[in-house]
């Protein structure tokens, strides 16, 4: 029997491996994807037009480079009868179909106030490539123009707004961050109400050298393909747009937004100013627990707005003995002033929601769960007919 030659077999395997590697190299670059196919949409703005819908997509396009500066951000606009039609127009302009799997931000322009927002957003709930996690917001003016803004901080409008609406910002109670999934659940509940951040742009014509350096640094990791000149922009996201049955119902101001977030979100890093005996105290709150509930009483509904926290004085509008500061004890009068301040904020919020007939606190949904008979009796009138009760408690950290 002929002896099996292992050396010859190894040589054959080696030759086959070299041939296969050469084939991959000369035909497919080892499976590397064409750089044009890696362009992704990171943010999208939607405006309503006379002809239908205008979608402005902010696209991150990788570019070959020797020094690592390899991403350019461009804005591409498409207009059609629906969002899907508008995205198809973007396909015609760019040569690739805009999949939204990496889209992190959706902005509705001011023109969307005149429509049911869920008719506008229908595509995003149907599309297989779209997650339900993109943050959604409404802006003043045009969403397309906002996305093309020249930024003072950050590479692009999408990146800057994403920071402002991050989970950390949400925990400060200053912004009402929500995503597609959250507004869908809220709108199609018994309360039929939802909300989202309202963005305002503010021009900064006299940018400091540091700000200009920040803007230039944005071109290292990414260069905006928007306008070259014009004023720098910064964004304010401290107001909230509210919706009833998918229709725009109004805007909550900064204090009402703050109160809404204290009741709806898990918050920390919270600061509340109050006045006691003519002196302004800024209270730092931790271990915050807030919520809105509803119960039946005497054949009617009572809305209960509850909040509790541990308090320390973060700042005082006068000089104080450092020894008293180190003790960390908050005077009883200051605690009561803080509670009164919070009750005032909650009352302002409840009054604004009642006036707009927008149950953003989900009182109807909660009453439906816990007292179905009373809900059926008050259906559509839970917010307007409910009495209001507060349970606000602050205690000193020291």
Feature-to-residue mapping (PLM):
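Membrane-proximal alpha-helical signals and transmembrane carboxylates
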Residues: 2-398
């Amino acid at each position: 029997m002929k002896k099996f030659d292992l050396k010859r077999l190894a040589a054959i395997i080696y030759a086959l491996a070299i041939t296969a590697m050469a084939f991959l190299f000369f035909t497919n670059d080892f499976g590397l994807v064409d750089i044009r196919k890696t362009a992704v949409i990171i943010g999208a703005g939607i405006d309503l037009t006379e002809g239908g819908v205008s979608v402005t997509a902010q696209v991150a396009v990788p570019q070959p480079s020797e020094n690592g500066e390899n991403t350019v951000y461009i804005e591409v606009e498409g207009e059609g009868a629906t969002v899907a039609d508008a995205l198809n127009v973007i396909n015609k302009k760019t040569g690739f179909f805009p999949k939204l799997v990496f889209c992190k931000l959706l902005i509705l322009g001011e023109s969307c106030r005149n429509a049911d927002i869920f008719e506008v957003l229908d595509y995003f709930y149907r599309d297989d490539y779209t997650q339900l996690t993109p943050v959604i917001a409404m802006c003043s003016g045009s969403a397309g123009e906002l996305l093309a803004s020249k930024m003072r901080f950050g590479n692009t409008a999408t990146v800057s707004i994403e920071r402002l609406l991050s989970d950390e910002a949400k925990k400060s109670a200053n912004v009402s961050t929500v995503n597609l999934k959250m507004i869908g659940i809220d709108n199609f509940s018994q309360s039929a109400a939802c909300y989202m951040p309202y963005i305002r742009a503010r021009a900064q014509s006299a940018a400091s050298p540091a700000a200009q350096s920040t803007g230039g640094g944005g071109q290292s990791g990414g260069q905006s393909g928007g306008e070259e000149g014009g004023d720098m922009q910064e964004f304010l996201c401290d107001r909230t747009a509210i919706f009833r049955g998918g229709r725009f119902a109004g805007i909550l101001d900064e204090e009402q937004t703050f109160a809404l977030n204290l009741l709806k979100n898990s918050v920390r890093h919270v600061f509340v100013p109050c006045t006691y005996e003519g002196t302004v105290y800024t209270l730092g709150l931790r271990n915050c627990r807030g919520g809105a509930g509803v119960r039946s009483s005497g054949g009617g509904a009572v809305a209960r707005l509850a909040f509790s926290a541990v308090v320390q004085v973060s700042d005082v509008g006068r000089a104080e003995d450092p020894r008293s500061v180190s003790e960390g004890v908050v005077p009883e009068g200051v605690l009561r002033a803080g509670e009164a301040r919070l009750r005032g904020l909650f009352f302002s919020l409840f009054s604004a929601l009642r006036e707009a007939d927008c149950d953003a606190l989900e009182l109807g949904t909660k009453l439906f769960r816990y007292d179905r008979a009373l809900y059926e009796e008050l259906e559509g009138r839970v917010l307007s007919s409910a009495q209001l009760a507060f349970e606000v408690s602050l205690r000193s950290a020291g």
